[in-house]
Curated annotation (Swiss-Prot):
EC number: 5.4.2.7
Superkingdom to which the source organism belongs: Bacteria
Catalytic activity of the protein: 2-deoxy-alpha-D-ribose 1-phosphate = 2-deoxy-D-ribose 5-phosphate; alpha-D-ribose 1-phosphate = D-ribose 5-phosphate
Gene Ontology MF term list: magnesium ion binding; manganese ion binding; phosphopentomutase activity
An annotated GO cellular component: cytosol
Protein name: Phosphopentomutase
Positions bound to Mn(2+) 1: 10, 347-348
Naturally occurring in which organism (per UniProt): Pectobacterium carotovorum subsp. carotovorum (strain PC1)
Amino acid sequence: MKRAYIMVLDSFGIGSSADAERFGDAGSDTLGHIAQACAAGTADKGRSGPLHLPNLSRLGLGKAAEASTGTFPAGLDENADIIGAYAHASEISSGKDTPSGHWEIAGVPVLFDWGYFKDEENSFPQDLLDKLVKRANLPGYLGNCHSSGTVILDQLAEEHMKTGKPIFYTSADSVFQIACHEETFGLDKLYELCEIAREELTEGGYNIGRVIARPFIGDKPGHFERTGNRHDLAVEPPAPTILKKMVDEKGGEVVSVGKIADIYAQVGITKKVKATGIDALFDATLKEMDSAGDNTIVFTNFVDFDSAYGHRRDIPGYAAALELFDRRLPEMLSRVKGDDILILTADHGCDPSWHGTDHTRENVPVLIYGPNVKPGSYGHRETFADIGQTVAAYFGLSPMDYGKSIL
């Protein structure tokens, strides 16, 4: 029985890539800087001491990071007994965004340039805004700028609740984000507005990767919080991913846990499981692993590393989340049996010690575990697509156009 379990620790980079200078990210290192802060005692909020990741260390995380940066992460166990295959991979996609990273993991790198809304203020074309107001029958809009999603709620959510005007904002990523109150504006109405925005952006040729619904609750600044009902409307990958090939060529099952289905525009997904928060995502993943049959991919995105800690530049929070994941990892490892393979990786970096609030261009870990996987170093992988090619070879799918099988 063949089953592949792919876990994306969203934004868990292990050192800036060779091309990071082009993105202003040379020197960024999500894992390394978190580990440094923990070792120095400056990340003791809600946790304490050096970064403690014994199970990830046994899979080769520390050694993969050392190969990426030349420095072993502070506090991790340099003498861990390695039980998995490990490597570090660089991205060849043109951007450092979520769809690019995930599509490349699935064998389809993004070699074109996404469209971006680059102006910090008055970010969106007036023609686009006018069409959204007219089609969705809106009283107007708020925002129209670059912002962190939590900051903009404290600034504009009260006015949004009074006026019914949705909050439009963007970032350095190829995104059009819409924040609305779940109760006063309504979730269904927000989703409908996002569908309209997706249509207008596509028809207008803006080449924007995602429209993101950002629902929230609360009644005053400091008390507003985003809910788990986020919904991403992505464009479809430009070529068949391993997920689509798994369904088309093998009649296999592809189970999305978390936001995976949204990232791939629902293409190549046979089952969607919603869950919010690391523990809930972990629980849902374990449940799907328990029921997975032959020719199944279970694919989970652990978004909180990125959304709750990376973008918010919260080093102690990120460290605590990694330690939580590591504590629960044995539950996952114990379910990997026979011919199964488990792959742990990331889609980009988001160094919580870095300036700004955006992603960082970094190498990512590729940690592979299974009873038939030979432990040890598998070096530097020149593209995330090596993961997709590995999965294609494992299941006997037709080869992907990019990447080399790792195993």
